[in-house]
């Protein structure tokens, strides 16, 4: 509901103004100024390995030999025979690697996880280590409770030790398992980090590993950047940024997508985290990737840029200096609505900056802004009116006049009939702000007559009776202050009262 107070979290990555507004108006604007996501997070949180026979470490002959029941598996893993350990673990892996409804709880309830963790330490038997890591990977891909069962039995440290295995298939499977564990929650992420996983992951990147392995590492690094309450420690961030910068120069789309997601998670943490990211010199590459034809790349990249320009004025200027505004103009014309929404949200954050940044925005994007108000879908228009209120409440008189007469009024007044009440509230705030703060009397009269010309007066008059109290109060306030002649000489003449 537009009238409710906005939770603090909703504003964390959305800059807005309102210093000169009354507190109730600030609250109404604050409740609407957030990124309305058009989709769920598109990065995969956890991954389950369902390719039964991908490993060259396992012969097809052995596949035919595996006919274990769960009781057979339990008996075999508790034996002293390494061959039975391998065959039973492999059978368990096959059991939970089916595509639909894998029986993860059967393995957990059978008490197999402690044995599987022990098998991770079986250095003379890399095939057994591989199978055990695979089973734990798939269990950790399940619910948080299932992931906790893996962590509780001490799997993290031996998995990290396997990152140094001379067998790439073993170390890659360990990376995968750690990615699933880290992606579950901040607690498990920090457990992985505190056990010194990051340096081992970085070492693997420099070894010329296969592209599939590198994809797993980039995804695992992104999960180490993921989750909040708390965000990852700044020391961990400083460790991860050099390899992330290196991966951002890669040409593989999956690696680029996961790396951009990692950076979007970090920059969501506030100005300190943004500082660590922008001081790497990575902004020009991020600006370049804003126009990627791959949505899997452009979406997290736009999230990252939008988060950065929600930071300090200096951080925003660094993005502008990297050419972000010119590229943003291209992205705002993207045929996909979800991309336009992200780009318009980014634009609104720039609009909350100081006047010289507002000037740069107006020079680069004002015609596009007007066009979006006229022709875009409502969810895009919503971000654009947030941009307009941010521009207006920080603008100079010249900028305010330019904005008022740029062509925004007609499409903006049309939005007073929008079904989204937050949009209606923001548009009313914009109209009120323009009428109150344009100082030049002729410009103010010009604004008034334009509002009447485009049917704004009638729309605002009708909104006095709206069921939403914030809308009706705002509309009444505008009518009483600016469209009624009350004898004090301050209001402009309303319709039928002109002389």
Curated annotation (Swiss-Prot):
Residues 1-57 form the IBB domain. The keyword Ribonucleoprotein does not apply. GO terms for biological process: blastocyst development; epigenetic regulation of gene expression; negative regulation of gene expression; positive regulation of gene expression; protein import into nucleus. Keywords: Nucleus, Protein transport, Repeat, Transport. Expressed predominantly in ovary. Isoform 1 is the predominant form. It is found in: Nucleus. This is Importin subunit alpha-8. It comes from Mus musculus (Mouse).
